[in-house]
Amino acid sequence: MSKTLLMPNDRATFALGQWLGERLVAGTVLLMMGDLGAGKTTLTKGIGRGLNIPDEIDSPTFTLINEYDSGRLPLYHVDLYRLEGAESDRLFLESYWEGIEYPPGIVAIEWAERLRYLPPEPLKIALAHHPKAVRQVTLTPSSPAQTCLVKALTTDAILADEI
């Protein structure tokens, strides 16, 4: 079961991220896919706001991983744009989602299509430009809890604070 939403502007994409950040549980891995400028970082900034992280959320394009631990849950923001194939294996990302070396939190992976193997039960988020809106966001859950979360998600719910 997937759900697709049309986001009328960047604020709506941010609001979707905030809505998710307020509801996600520790150990959630978000696999974000989409072209340049599709809104992956904007969505992650909203997630940070929803997690009550006071720090500015920046794209880790050059650092590869940014860690934020001052919110309701830690946020591990990963950007695989500059990596290819086996290079992502060397980041040992499983140490983030397994909660062994790092406290369990939210792992948000941009350019997740570059991963060679997927974590268990990720929430897949595909972002794309759309002719009738700024972007289209499709969420595909892989666990019962994520399915409940996605079912509860409506454009009206996330845009309520924008009106």
Predicted feature locations:
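Short phosphate-coordinating micro-motif centered on Lys-Gly-acidic
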Residues: 3, 86, 92-163
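Phosphate-binding P-loop
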Residues: 21-27
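Conserved lysine of the Walker
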Residues: 40
